[in-house]
Amino acid sequence: MSKNIENHDSVLLLQDCIAGCKMALESMDDIREHTDDKQLRELIDKYYDEHTRLSVDCRDMLDKAGADIKEPGVFAKMAAKLQTAMKMAVNDDQSQAAKLLTEGCNMGIETISGSLNEYRDADSKSVAIAERLRTCLFYTSPSPRDTR
């Protein structure tokens, strides 16, 4: 283990963070395709950039530790893509896009919160990145009322 990552829990937490960032980025790409609302598009772009920065930070720490990068599960990626396509095909409005973003953020917050609880021995740098991701997810989630 590198001195940059103190223990195995830190690696596991960062791997969950990077997988979550990748899921979020793919979901935002999928939703952006169905979005013509300028305000919602700007929100997606802002948090897309933040998730990208978080992903790079995780990757850098994992690379320094010589740890593998975790990919989101194939089933989870396909299910998210299919859900977005189906829901937007039925109701292709900005409120639906905002709801999908909110649902994704809620799942991400749950997942990262669970990882923080599970990997209690993670070092402070890894925990700080996970907390940044959780905060980013919280603020990414738009209110459907804001897009009407």
Predicted regions and their residues:
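Carboxylate-rich helix-loop segments that flank metal/cofactor sites and access channels
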Residues: 60-109
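Acidic interhelical loop/turn segments
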Residues: 114-132
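Short loop-to-helix capping motifs
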Residues: 37-38, 123
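Short, charged, amphipathic alpha-helical segments
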Residues: 41-49, 76, 99-102, 127-132
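Single conserved hydrophobic/aromatic residue that forms the stacking wall/gate
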Residues: 139-148
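Conserved alpha-helical segments that form or flank metal/cofactor-binding pockets of metalloenzymes
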Residues: 39-75
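Alpha-helical bundle segments that constitute or directly flank the non-heme di-iron/ferroxidase center
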Residues: 3-35, 96-120
